[in-house]
């Protein structure tokens, strides 16, 4: 028997980027769910300092194809963007057996007060979890993929460049994966302190003689694995310089249209280093026979309640102040870790 729709059309609001550094609200009509769909009211959503700020600033090539299931087309303006939303299901369509009204879910969806999506898109969050922790599903999934790409071995040393949200998560997971030592490099003192609180062995400030300091801290070997997740092309050079012979540099940043100049004639060539791109849209090929996105998500949901991720939320804005939140992230990135938008319980 098909479920009865509790509501008809619902009026909502979505945040759009109309032009570089211009965020504005636009009305949305949220239709009742059709067969195989669910309708969700947003509780909180998270602003990504990496990819999302590239989009906000207009630093993504406009002909790049959007790769999120809730988005279609390309990255040109105007664009509705965002991919970390937690809300509650309030209506389900015919044939939906896995969701009921009241279920707490994570959805890769732009910043919007309510939305209707196919039932295969929402992710059930663990019972009793704080919605704030649920916001980290996307970043944690990215971090798991990066650690898989790093292929860290028991007792090896890893250095993570950048201690934003993804960098903090990568460093924590590298320890859980068996790294003997994990060092981090981060210019912001508050983030270095948070990095230490999350269990890394040493948090370094970038600058003069960084590679030399890393070699000294690793008994002259250098790092077995370096991970560049700061978004800074300069940090990629530092990662290459700090990597041990036959070591791996994992490039997990998306630089957008920022030019990247890398000297491949010195340390990279003589040390026989490997450069590896990491992007969450694909499972590492050597794992594909055994891993898929469903298994990766199971791992994320198992880790989610155990990492105390609420501590990473540094700023909380009402949804109606979203344009101000984006200006803050754009102009003062060093003052924050994770900025969230609060819609009130159930929108």
Residues covered by each model-derived region:
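N-terminal glycine-rich beta->alpha transition that marks the start or flank
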Residues: 28-85
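A glycine-/small-residue-rich N-terminal strand-loop-strand element
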Residues: 81-108
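A structural motif shared across PLP-dependent enzymes of the aminotransferase-like
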Residues: 108-119
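Mid-domain Rossmann-like dinucleotide-binding core that forms the NAD(H)/NADP(H) cofactor-binding site
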Residues: 130-208, 212
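Glycine-rich cofactor phosphate-binding loops and adjacent beta1-alpha1 units
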Residues: 198-276
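C-terminal substrate-binding/catalytic core of Rossmann-like NAD(P)-dependent dehydrogenases/reductases
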Residues: 220, 262-313, 324
